[in-house]
Amino acid sequence: MSHHQAVSQLHLFVSILDALFSDPDCLLSSFMNVTEDELDELWSWNSPLQPELRFCMHEKVSEQAALHPEKIAIDAWDGTLTYRQVEDYSTDLAQTLQLLDGSHNQIIPVLFEKSRWTSVAVLAIMKAGACFALLDPAQPEGRLRAVVQQVSARLFVSSKAQATLAARVAPAATIIPVSASKFDKVYSPCAAQQPKTTLPPVSPDQPLYIQFTSGSTGLPKGCILTHSQYTSGAIPRADAVGYRSHSRVLDFASYAFDVCIDSMLCTLAHGATLCTPSDERRMNDMSGAMRDMRVTFAGMTPSVARTLDVDILDHLDSIALGGEGVSTSDAMSWGQRTRVVNAYGPSEATVGATINDNVASKPYITMGKRKGCAIWLTDPEDSNKLVPPGAVGELLIEGPIVATDISITRRKPRKFSLKIPNSWLKGSKSFPGRHGRIYKTGDLVRFDPDGNGEPIFVGRQDQQVKLRGQRIKLAEIEFNMQKHLPADTQLAVEVIKPSGGGEQTLVAFLVEQKKNGMRHLDGNVFGSFTTKFQSALKDMTKQLAVDLPGYMVPSAYIPLWKMPLLVSCKTDRKRLREIGTSVTRQDLRRFNSVISEKKEPTTEMEIKLRSLWGKLLGGEDDFSANDNFFSMGGDSLRAMRLVAAAREAGLVLNVPDIMLNPTLSAMATKIKPLSEEATNDVPAFSLIEKDWDMNSAKAETAKLCGVDVNEVQDVYPCTPLQEGLMALSAKFQDAYVAQRIATLPSETAQRLKEAFDTAAEGSPILRTRIVNVSGRGLFQVVLKNGRLLREHGADPAEYLRRDREEAMDLGTALFRYGLVQEAGSDETHFVITMHHAVYDGWSMPLIFDRINRAFNGLQTERSVSFKHFIKHLTSLDPAEAQDYWRERLAGVNPYQFPPLPQKGYTTQADSLLEHYVSVPTTAHNKLTLATIIRGAWALVSSLYMGHPDVVFGETLTGRSAPVNGIEEIEGPMITTVPIRVRLSLDRPISDYLQAVHAQTVKQIPHEHLGLQNIRRLSKDARVACDLRTGLVLHPREDDVGEVDMEAVPANTFLPADDAEAAREALKFNTYALMLVCTLDENGFLIMASFDSKCISKDAMERVLVVMNRIVTAFLGNPESKLGDVAVLDPSEAQDAEAMRPRDVMSDSGIGTSPIDSPKLDAAMKALSPNEEKLHSILGRILGMPETEIKSSDSFFELGGDSIGAMRLVSDARAQGLTLTVAQVFQSQSLAELAASIGNEKEDKLLDILSRILGMPKSEINGSDSFFELGGDSIGAMRLVSDARAQGLNLTVAQVFQSQSLSELASSAEETDSPQTETNSNAPYAALGKEASLYSPDRIGAYLQDQSWEIVDVYPTRPLQQLAVEGTVDLPRYSLRYELIKFATPINRQKLEQACQELVARNEVLRTVFVKDESKVLGVVLSSPRVPYSEIAVPDGEDINAFSQANIQKDIEAPKPHGSS
């Protein structure tokens, strides 16, 4: 209890005693009245009342323009404007408005996407003496039209992009589109000749703007505020919130909410800069937009603030929160990083009536100090009666900020403000009374017990609610529902919180009149609907989606036998909310099923299956025989779990059956009883080839693993996935290797180590290595002793570095861990390193569950292991899969999205975007969201590439195979397949998606053939498998609740949530574009990892917007045709045209060849070494420039003769080429002649290639490249291995880089001479062949301090280069600052010594970055003394604000390459 509360209660106690002694018959209610002292205290909190401010905000903006004409006023995504431009452009537009219609006080709607021109339009209307109504184009057209009709708009100002929409919603108005071109004349030489009109003086009493909110009549309610009413609140409010002349203010709020008016006018009136991101970035990349625009002040709801990256807060001077309650934990957390402000204010009393500018100062949140007003608390049932401090009352706002008029329609305006009640006119014993306007807010609050007069929010009194930050009048929803239902229907809309937790939900309670008053025999309050009423509900739901925003459409319709009523005969809403808390989310799903006919399961299998559905989806009795598994919340992940649940129940069901028969009745017909036979055992060495005996297999694989032959426990083939992953690791050393670290108490770490070893004994995959057996291919070898522990260490950074450098290669352990304990520490760093060839996202939790159980002394028994899956793969007839893929990919379109910048380009992802796609809660679809995403992406690709035939890759779980117990197999089973989709724009969307779904099911038996095997089937297959886009879908995992991490420490190594798991998948991206979609109950998050050289970031942002639009269209109107949604806007179409191959654009009339076309292959193809030598010799012999000699020319076409042929053979021999005159005569081209030149190394490679690729040597010549012949990563590894056996030393990288067999043979080294081993740790070694180019003198010239001593130089990676540029260039987005507060004084000299020692001991902290031509290099220094500054905080300064100011100075200071 606070001191103020104690004193108040003591005074109340004394007054009650006095009253009892003086009048024992007094009523108890009399003690609830405000005492004289309390009334005096209330008046002291509300006195004096700020006088009305009699000027207009646009006058303040004009003053700023006069003071700072060239200062940037608006920094927007679509351009910048100076204060001079804002002033001149708004004046020019105001004169235009006057010329078109000179009447004062008319209301002019304003319709813009987020843009620099919105502020100009608003100021122009203010200067013209009119009243503006801001609209958001994202709102439904029906709502926009209702607003425009209310204001009887004659003029309508819009952006150029929204002019068409403006014309639709206001057909009778004159549309004035605003864009840059409109103001070209303002600074032109003929500007003086333009017609002008004198702008009228604007009175502070004139209307400034009208703000629309939910209305109880079903129409939006309009509230008009005058200039003086707004200014009287904005001026004191802006100072408290934190608007300063140096502020860079985020323009975040939707134009539908009045907060955006403050963002514009308060910013410009204070000489600050308004930062306006695009709508797309505002919704999908707010943190990135704020970084790019260097925002220092932002206003938003707490829900949005929680989505910001942590470092964003560090760069803000203030963050203003409003629109919904702020939690104490959020306030405390954010308050450590920036100044947190809490604002409250209904539209009827301007944007903010109270401001708490020190939110983090208390363990609870108040609404803050009054600004431009007084605040009173009255009895909710009697507005004339004040409540005493501490009691809950309705908040009333008094003062000049209270609006005068409300509900503006074509009829007479209605006054809504109240006069101060007579009981208040007299004031108190210390304060005189007064007259004024008052607004009843409907909010229930109480005063802060500290006695400072600040209110604390308690709740809402009326039907106005807040849901996810949106202000909703329930009556508006009820009105719109009632229009489409029978007139005698009783209904009430409420926000409930269903039992079982989770988010609040908007629902509608309904009583069908024919059943009113009936009651179920068991007393159940829930009723039912007749068939006719259900039909009416279906039609109403469709109409609500047109009339109302999505957040105002109920998510469920709950039938009641009788509507609960109060004594007053009003709806008992409290009782409805109580009923809502008894409803589960399964109940809501059941209530929502009224739109479909219910049929009870009847057969034994249907009843059993319903039980399984219930366990998996919740609510066993909810499901009818015609319910669709996917409509009820099922997806591919739950389909696999259903298979497992069925097996536990003694039933056999497989995933394809579920996908093809999604209704409960159809699915039940596919179920079979599980046979009694136990799972067949798979003996060791039983899966290898028959001509490879066990002893030979053990001996060969043991040698390749470097272990004793007795250590080999089993050998079996690799999956195609494993082969591909190992091949990519050979190309990129750290590809597909994950490294994770957990810091644990040393005792826990030691127990966990023992648990790992125990788990390895029972899990063969942890003891598995992969080897390449010459002549046989890749095999996995299971060892008896996995030896997972790599080593101990004392320096975490050093261990991690060395661990990364130790490649996970053929023959090495693919899962290992290390323990690192620093000296004197009682904690241990537990590091695990694992290769994707032994785990995937499904098996990883299984492995760590085994480890956790071992940690707790429990055994784990699994009925199947990875080799059971291998047995299944080896039992398949490969011919069936080959026929399927050969037919599936026949005639495929060779152009894929996104295109490569040039032929042979190797992609490397360097950019990442995220975009959330909301799925309407009212959308019911009988297909999975995964199918919709596949179909939508296929249409997006088709639109951009201009072709109805598209291909992209998809990575699947691979656990749809018919293997008993497949869901508990510990091992990687994911697989990637080419998804080919052919589109017809005349086809209905529902039919198209059904075809995509059917294709997905049909490919299940063939999905494990492997990309490297599919590509060898045909030329078309090879083209299709050169995948540019990879798609990964992450279904939402069920929430298992809180877990005791001390009992399951291995879970520390698992991704924290679905989003983190998705981000981990992105680390393994080898595509030009990888899309990872994380699905949840409200939609899905797209994470796009891409190579910006293939598609720019801006273009990719627009692609994701197109994807969002198409998914929404698919769900919103599945019966429309594909062509109806296959539309690109002008900017998107421009992107598509730039990407599209020229010969695909048949309507363009351009006949040039595509960049990838075979017509240009010969011209673009690099010459082989033999061709280069022939060209040089022929140029000499024939006396012609080499540039005129083409590989397609023959010797005689170039003018050669027999003598020339003899000279050619002779000169060729001098250059090491073995050639005969007969070959010269027989060759039809120089390319063919060069290919016919033989050498021993090339012949060896020819033999190997013929064997690996399975094609005759006669079909291979020296000008062919390995990949043109159908080679892939796996083949490259086999080629290197077999070449080494033939005495040729090659690397996988050389195979990838060589353009022809001849070039590859030239680069191969004979292994007769001993190989010299290079020291990879030597200085400059990381630069490879370029090391000689970078001498210390050359690098030293770039350093800021020439005295620094260079230790090493290394190249940087693309993302590292991006971070460096983000430090050197403005705006800076790669800097990080940490503010550490010490509780007690410290030795400052020792602190500096410690900082310098930290730098000296860590190589990365001693690294600076220089730029040599276009390359960014990391330069490791010996022991530089880094800058260290001590800055004293002036007396009276706030240390946080002072620190932020110094941080901002440092951000703006130059940071050139070569500096520390």
UniProtKB/Swiss-Prot annotation:
- Stretches of Polar residues bias are at 1313-1322
Q: Which residues form the Carrier domain?
A: 600-675, 1168-1241, 1236-1312
Molecular function as annotated in GO: ligase activity; phosphopantetheine binding
Residues annotated as region Disordered? 1303-1324
Q: What does this protein do?
A: NRPS involved in extracellular coprogen-type siderophores biosynthesis. The role of extracellular siderophores in fungal virulence to plants is to supply iron to the fungus during plant infection, but not to act as phytotoxins, depriving their hosts of iron.
Lipid biosynthesis listed as a keyword: no
User: Where on the chain is O-(pantetheine 4'-phosphoryl)serine found, per UniProt?
Assistant: S636, S1202, S1273
Q: Which Pfam families match?
A: AMP-binding, Condensation, PP-binding
Q: What is known of its domains?
A: NRP synthetases are composed of discrete domains (adenylation (A), thiolation (T) or peptidyl carrier protein (PCP) and condensation (C) domains) which when grouped together are referred to as a single module. Each module is responsible for the recognition (via the A domain) and incorporation of a single amino acid into the growing peptide product. Thus, an NRP synthetase is generally composed of one or more modules and can terminate in a thioesterase domain (TE) that releases the newly synthesized peptide from the enzyme.
Annotated region described as Adenylation, given as residue ranges: 63-468
For this UniProt record, give its keywords in alphabetical order, as a comma-separated list. Ligase, Multifunctional enzyme, Phosphopantetheine, Phosphoprotein
SUPFAM superfamilies, per database record: Acetyl-CoA synthetase-like (SSF56801), ACP-like (SSF47336), CoA-dependent acyltransferases (SSF52777)
Family, according to the entry, reads as follows:
Belongs to the NRP synthetase family.
Any one GO BP annotation for this protein: amino acid activation for nonribosomal peptide biosynthetic process
Q: Which GO terms describe its cellular component?
A: cytoplasm
Condensation, as annotated region? 712-1135
Disruption of the gene: reported phenotype: Leads to increased sensitivity to oxidative stress and raduces the virulence toward Arabidopsis thaliana plants.
Disulfide bonds listed in the record:
none
Entries under InterPro entries matching the protein: ACP-like_sf (IPR036736), AMP-bd_C_sf (IPR045851), AMP-binding_CS (IPR020845), AMP-dep_synth/lig_dom (IPR000873), ANL_N_sf (IPR042099), CAT-like_dom_sf (IPR023213), Condensatn (IPR001242), PKS_PP-bd (IPR020806)
Question: What protein name applies here?
Answer: Nonribosomal peptide synthetase 6
Which species?
Answer: Alternaria brassicicola (Dark leaf spot agent)
- The gene it comes from is NPS6
Its EC number(s): 6.3.2.-
Q: In which pathway does it act?
A: Siderophore biosynthesis
Induction field = Expression is up-regulated under iron depletion.
